[in-house]
């Protein structure tokens, strides 16, 4: 009887990650792209560990998984996993804490400048042969000296603050779980009252998990208090912004624009109003999709599994359940 640990890789990870485990003497590895509940339930019942990308892992997939000890998430969000059931079964959840912070921060920079400088409109104007109409085009927005609010101050938030201070912006941070001193050490200013803070912000970028407390946190009541020149960017989780409320606020010119990388439902339904709103820059949950980042994430996802069974996984990578 083999003493090897059985590992299920749910959805492909970068080949550099697979190289760490495919020929490892302590593991038998199986890959699956079938993310149906029936398949995952069947596959997991004999597994000791698994990795997961964005597929859902509801509690019923853990039924019968008597040996399952670790699920390594390819990313930092974990709202696709039934945490309550994982806790009941003493299954640890690990995240790729170090892989994507810089990449997502760069994406936010790109999206902000794209929206502020009306990149798509200006590009289309030239391509359509309307260069001569340049003086009729709407003006753009500078980011210099503007107020930038980071909502959530984990690794991505810390990567952001370095970059936006380089733009000479005034950086504020909303995170009830981070001490004021930690924020000020990096050049930011902590805000305690979110409802009051958003009234004076020019840019708001979301980097917090989706929880009962953060779901629909950005809603019409909050949006209507923002500056008409405000740009809001979400590269965290879709449910944090109420999508219909955002569409309404944009149509009423309550804010300048939005950058959306994540949706409440992925892929979004065809009738999602944001898909037809030209004031929104959209991307398909690809803020971390650089080759460099995907390599790091693939390697860290697999290394977390190996480190767990070798009892050397960093505690900071394990989700508190």
In which residue ranges do the predicted regions lie?
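An N-terminal-biased, well-structured beta-alpha scaffold segment characteristic
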Residues: 1-94, 199, 219
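Short, Asp-centered acidic motifs that coordinate Mg2+ and/or phosphate
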Residues: 48-49, 70, 203, 231, ...
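Rossmann-like adenosine-cofactor binding region
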Residues: 56-62, 178-273
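Phosphate-binding beta-alpha-beta segment of Rossmann-like dinucleotide-binding domains, i.e.
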Residues: 89-91, 97-147, 159-162
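Glycine-rich Rossmann-fold phosphate-binding loop(s) that bind the pyrophosphate
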Residues: 153-154
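NAD(P)-binding Rossmann-fold cofactor-contacting core
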Residues: 166-184
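Adenosine-phosphate binding glycine-rich loop
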Residues: 268-269, 277-298
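NAD(P)-dependent dehydrogenase/reductase Rossmann-like domain
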Residues: 296-321
């Amino acid at each position: 009887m083999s003493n090897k640990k059985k590992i299920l890789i749910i959805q492909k990870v970068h080949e550099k990650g697979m190289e760490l485990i495919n020929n490892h003497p302590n593991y038998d590895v199986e890959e699956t792209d079938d993310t149906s509940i029936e398949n995952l339930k069947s596959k997991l019942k004999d597994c000791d560990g698994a990795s997961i990308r964005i597929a859902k892992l509801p509690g019923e997939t853990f039924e019968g998984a008597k040996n399952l000890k670790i699920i390594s998430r390819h990313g930092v969000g974990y709202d696709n996993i039934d945490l309550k059931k994982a806790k009941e079964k003493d299954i640890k959840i690990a995240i790729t804490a170090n892989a994507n912070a810089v990449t997502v921060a760069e994406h936010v920079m790109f999206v902000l400048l794209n929206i502020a400088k009306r990149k798509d409109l200006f590009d289309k104007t030239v391509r359509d042969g309307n260069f001569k109409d340049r003086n009729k085009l709407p003006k753009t927005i500078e980011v210099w000296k503007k107020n930038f609010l980071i909502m959530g101050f984990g690794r991505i938030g810390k990567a952001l603050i370095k970059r936006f201070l380089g733009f000479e912006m005034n950086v504020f941070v909303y995170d009830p779980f981070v001490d004021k001193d930690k924020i000020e050490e990096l050049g930011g200013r902590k805000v305690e009252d979110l409802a009051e803070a958003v009234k004076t912000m020019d840019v708001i970028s979301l980097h917090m998990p989706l929880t009962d407390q953060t779901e629909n946190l950005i809603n019409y009541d909050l949006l209507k208090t923002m500056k008409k020149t405000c740009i809001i960017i979400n590269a965290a989780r879709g449910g944090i912004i109420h999508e219909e409320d955002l569409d309404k606020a944009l149509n009423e010119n309550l804010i300048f624009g939005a950058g959306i990388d994540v949706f409440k439902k992925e892929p979004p339904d065809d009738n999602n109003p944001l898909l037809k709103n030209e004031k929104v820059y959209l991307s398909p949950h690809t803020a971390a999709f650089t080759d460099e980042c995907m390599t790091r994430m693939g390697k860290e996802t697999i290394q977390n599994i190996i480190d767990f069974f070798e009892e050397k996984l960093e505690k900071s990578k394990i989700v508190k359940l």
